[in-house]
């Protein structure tokens, strides 16, 4: 009883702490081992009860090893307990967890023992160890194993002592696991060794369970040995085979042999990069400091160069200096992982270096070599870089590093002692033509993976479109990603059910639903009929799918092309990534582009020159005739206030880009002071807002295909114009973090009131007045005068980069009347939402135009006139209850010029139909 209580209380505690304070647990167990167990004695009541957990908590301290050892050693006497305890001190956390899960399984089944079957269930239930992974890969899961165990041995009586002994066969398994660990050269016992011991035992319930689940013990053993890095032959000799340890256990645990992968054909082919591979080979042939460091932007193919070297070595296409060598890539994350105590990381690294020194044919490849700086460093410890420095300098360690330019500058250049040990090899971004060759080399691998074909045009389009439209990444990485995703898209599209199978599948779901309802309603005759129909539908669907598969197979075997990835698929992926339409122009879109002027004129009255210029620019860009290194177009709209400069930009955004919100609008009156200019590209380092990015650059990075409106450009600080020079000329701008933002797919519109005084005068000279009939001559004169004013205000290098300077005309009274119709229609639409039908008379419309027409102020006075004459009068009537929901109202002007609102009745002039947009 006493021992039972101690086990149930202490064993889980030891297990929980073993992960973080293993040394402390062992020390405590050693110290407490000799302390006696006392029984509670009371005067007159001797032997009333034994000590329970609460009585003995401060006295009894037992570790996991002593608890399990007591169960194993009990039949053999006390002599062997020290040996068994020593064995259990070698158990890893996962092995301890397996034993404890085995005890839990015994309790669950109501058994008073832990046998081989419970150990097997514990191995499966642990879930993360090598043993669990191997069993899972063999298709063995915990649920099925539990069912088989219950079939074979059944359930127990239900009463289980807290202290559960091991069966003799289970003890034998634990002893065999120790032998397996010794044969593998391991000084610990993990879950994999327990599984090998279980397989070595070969008899018992666990073996029967594995047999009934269809698992082959030899296959399981082979898989376990492969996963722990040992070949089958090394352990195949069994018990008498001796212990032939690994030659390079640390390297095989923390590294991957690229040369072996190249021999097995598991690496992608490396196309080009001959110069870089030759330079790496030259540096590796040096006597000292023979450590090349590949430096390049992310995605240009630095790792591929190391793989290319491994492929050359496996093919024998290398000079004798590195012939027969192995390229092993080191996983720094795995090397650091799990080093809880001081010195563990350094010990691993020193073992690694010793193994490399003993084997002259090892070339170490460290991807992201900057992770050496600071790796494993703690208070008072030295990092990996400083441990490796002496070996790197003396040539004892051949190492290829790879890192980006930024990381090299940030980490390695700061440490000159480390920098001099590495010889930099620059890896430039390949050109578009080189990228096309790389894609052709990789084509076969991606065709096999996606089970389709790539056309030559699709590969060329991937290289060209990724270079043109995806500006924040590098070739060939972005082009490879394009063909990969396009292949996935085409495969998914062809993997869908045929149309006839879809219809049958829909009917099948309905039949299944009806059958279940019939069963619930106990209408078994109907349920039987529906079941027959269900089976018939399933057979039909299977036949259709098999037929389509056979057709595809026949096409493939006959040499006919299966699913094809075309240029259109690549264009679709680029559009989905960037939001820039790069697909071929459809017939519907052609009509929209050709009728663009008409559509824009429904919102913009007059201003033909501006509308035509905008439409021409969009058409030019959409068919691909624009200069690829400049923005779509850049305009400056100059003219008096209220004539539609900003409205035209809004109309364009709403019509072509989807909504007015698709436009990036910057009010330049916010950038009047010098210190506010930095808001466009982001605050410099050390200032508030540095991490947030610029208002302009961040907006364009998120939406590269849009209209950018710089409203009231003349109000901005002159430094803004200096910043805009490179946007207008090269279509690019660098933000405060050094990232290049691409403006090549933006339409830049700047509005200005410069020259409005000249326009107001109508271009008249002293003593001359031009008639309205001569408006074209007048407009040309006004345009030249406004251009002169713009030249006086803006620098010539700024104006010279603009595509066009468009001068807006003043609005005539007729145009103001058309604008009034548009504004009145907006009011009608708002009232329709309130279920009120509104009409206005011709008199009222004339009154609005008379009050709202002012050539100097454009259409804005019209808005105020409608607000005062119509909205105010109507609001009063609605509040007074004279106009309610469901009513129709007519707005008119009486003989005195006052506005009157009438419920749609008689005695009023014939109303004007609601104003429609023209």
UniProtKB/Swiss-Prot annotation:
Cellular localisation: Plastid, Chloroplast
Keyword terms: ATP-binding, Chaperone, Chloroplast, Nucleotide-binding, Plastid, Repeat, Transit peptide
PROSITE patterns, A to Z: CLP_R, CLPAB_1, CLPAB_2, UVR
Region annotated I, chain positions: 251-498
Region (Repeat 2): 166-230
GO CC term, one of those recorded: chloroplast
SMART domains from the UniProt entry: AAA, ClpB_D2-small
GO molecular function, one term: ATP hydrolysis activity
Stretches for region Repeat 1: 91-156
Tissue occurrence: Widely expressed.
Organism superkingdom: Eukaryota
Any single Pfam family the record assigns to this protein: AAA_lid_9
Keyword Chloroplast part of the UniProt annotation: yes
Clp R domain span: 88-230
Domain UVR: start-end pairs: 505-540
Family: Belongs to the ClpA/ClpB family. ClpC subfamily.
Described function: Molecular chaperone that may interact with a ClpP-like protease involved in degradation of denatured proteins in the chloroplast.
Protein name per Swiss-Prot or TrEMBL: Chaperone protein ClpC1, chloroplastic
Organism: Oryza sativa subsp. japonica (Rice)
């Amino acid at each position: 009883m006493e021992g039972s209580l101690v086990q149930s209380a202490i064993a889980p505690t030891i297990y929980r702490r073993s992960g973080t304070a293993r040394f402390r647990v062992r020390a405590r167990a050693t110290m407490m081992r000799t302390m006696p167990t006392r029984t509670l004695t009371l005067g007159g009541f001797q032997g009333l009860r034994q000590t329970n957990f609460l009585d003995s908590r401060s006295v009894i301290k037992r570790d996991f090893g002593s608890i399990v050892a007591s169960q194993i050693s009990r039949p053999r006497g006390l002599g062997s307990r020290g040996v068994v305890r020593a064995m259990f001190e070698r158990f890893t956390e996962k092995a301890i967890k397996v034993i404890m899960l085995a005890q839990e399984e015994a309790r669950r089944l109501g058994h008073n023992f832990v046998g081989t079957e419970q150990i097997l269930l514990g191995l499966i239930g642990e879930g993360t160890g090598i043993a669990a992974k191997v069993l899972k890969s063999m298709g063995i899961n915990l649920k099925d194993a539990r069912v088989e165990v219950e079939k074979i041995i059944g359930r127990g009586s239900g009463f289980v002592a807290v202290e559960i002994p091991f069966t003799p066969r289970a003890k034998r398994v634990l002893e065999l696991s120790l032998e397996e660990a010794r044969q593998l050269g391991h000084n610990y016992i993990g879950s994999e060794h327990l599984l090998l011991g279980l397989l070595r035992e070969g008899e018992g319930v666990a073996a029967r369970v594995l047999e009934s689940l269809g698992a082959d013990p030899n296959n399981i053993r082979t898989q376990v040995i492969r996963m722990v890095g040992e070949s089958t032959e090394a352990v195949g000799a069994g018990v008498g085979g001796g212990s032939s340890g690994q030659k390079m256990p640390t390297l095989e645990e923390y590294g991957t042999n690229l040369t072996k992968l190249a021999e097995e054909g598991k690496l992608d082919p490396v196309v080009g990069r001959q110069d870089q591979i030759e330079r790496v080979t030259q540096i590796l042939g040096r006597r000292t400091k023979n450590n090349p460091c590949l430096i390049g932007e992310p995605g240009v193919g630095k790792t591929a160069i190391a793989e290319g070297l491994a492929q050359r070595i496996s093919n024998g296409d290398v000079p004798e200096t590195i012939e027969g060598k192995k390229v092993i890539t080191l996983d720094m994350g795995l090397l650091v992982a799990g080093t809880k105590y001081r010195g563990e990381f350094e010990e691993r690294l020193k073992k690694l270096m010793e193994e490399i020194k003993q084997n002259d044919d090892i070339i170490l490849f460290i991807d992201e070599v900057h992770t050496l700086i600071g790796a494993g460093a703690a208070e008072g410890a030295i990092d990996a870089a400083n441990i490796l420095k002496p070996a790197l300098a003396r040539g004892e360690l051949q190492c290829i590093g790879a890192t980006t330019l930024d990381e090299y500058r940030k980490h390695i250049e700061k440490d000159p002692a480390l920098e001099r040990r590495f010889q930099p090899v620059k890896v430039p971004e390949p050109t578009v033509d080189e990228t096309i060759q790389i894609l052709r080399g990789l084509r076969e691998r991606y065709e096999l993976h996606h089970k389709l074909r790539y056309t030559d045009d699709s590969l060329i389009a991937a290289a060209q479109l990724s270079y043109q439209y995806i500006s924040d990444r590098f070739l060939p990485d972005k082009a490879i990603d394009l063909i990969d995703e396009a292949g996935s898209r085409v495969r998914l599209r062809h993997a869908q059910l045929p149309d006839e199978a879809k219809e049958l599948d829909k009917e099948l779901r309905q039949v299944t639903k009806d059958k279940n309802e019939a069963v619930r309603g106990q209408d078994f005759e109907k349920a039987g009929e529906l079941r027959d129909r269900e089976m018939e539908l399933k057979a039909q669907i299977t036949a259709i799918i098999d037929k389509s598969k056979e057709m595809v197979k026949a096409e493939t075997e006959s040499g006919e092309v299966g699913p094809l990835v075309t240029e259109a698929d690549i264009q679709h992926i680029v559009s989905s990534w960037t939001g820039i339409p790069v697909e071929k122009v459809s017939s519907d879109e052609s009509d929209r582009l050709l009728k663009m002027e008409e559509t824009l004129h429904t919102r913009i009255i007059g201003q033909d020159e501006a509308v035509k210029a905008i439409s021409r620019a969009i058409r030019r860009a959409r068919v691909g005739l624009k200069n690829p290194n400049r923005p779509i177009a850049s305009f400056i709209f100059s003219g008096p206030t209220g004539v539609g400069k900003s409205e035209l930009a809004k109309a364009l955004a709403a019509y072509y880009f989807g909504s007015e919100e698709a436009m990036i609008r910057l009010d330049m009156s916010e950038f009047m002071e010098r210190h506010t200019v930095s808001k466009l590209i982001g605050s410099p380092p050390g200032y508030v807002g540095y991490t947030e990015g610029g208002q302009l650059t961040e907006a364009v990075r998120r939406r590269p295909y849009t209209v950018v409106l710089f409203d009231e450009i003349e109000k901005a600080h002159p430094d803004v114009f200096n910043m805009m020079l490179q946007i207008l000329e090269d279509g690019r701008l660098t933000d405060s973090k050094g990232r290049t933002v691409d403006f090549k797919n933006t339409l830049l519109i700047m509005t200005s009131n410069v020259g409005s005084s000249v326009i107001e005068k109508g271009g008249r000279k002293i003593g001359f007045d031009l008639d309205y009939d001569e408006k074209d001559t007048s407009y040309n004169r006004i345009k030249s005068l406004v251009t002169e004013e713009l030249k006086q205000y803006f620098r010539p290098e700024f104006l010279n980069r603009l595509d066009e300077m468009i001068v807006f005309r003043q609005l005539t009274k007729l145009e103001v009347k058309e604008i009034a119709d548009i504004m009145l229609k907006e009011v009608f639409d708002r009232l329709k939402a309130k279920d009120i039908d509104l009409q206005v008379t011709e008199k009222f419309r004339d009154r609005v135009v008379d009050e709202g027409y002012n050539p100097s102020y454009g259409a804005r006075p019209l808005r105020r006139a409608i607000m005062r004459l119509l909205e105010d009068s109507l609001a009063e009537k609605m509040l007074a209850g004279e106009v309610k929901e469901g009513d129709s109202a007519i707005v008119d002007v009486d003989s005195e010029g006052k506005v009157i609102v009438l419920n749609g009745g008689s005695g009023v002039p014939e109303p004007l139909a609601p104003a429609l947009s023209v």
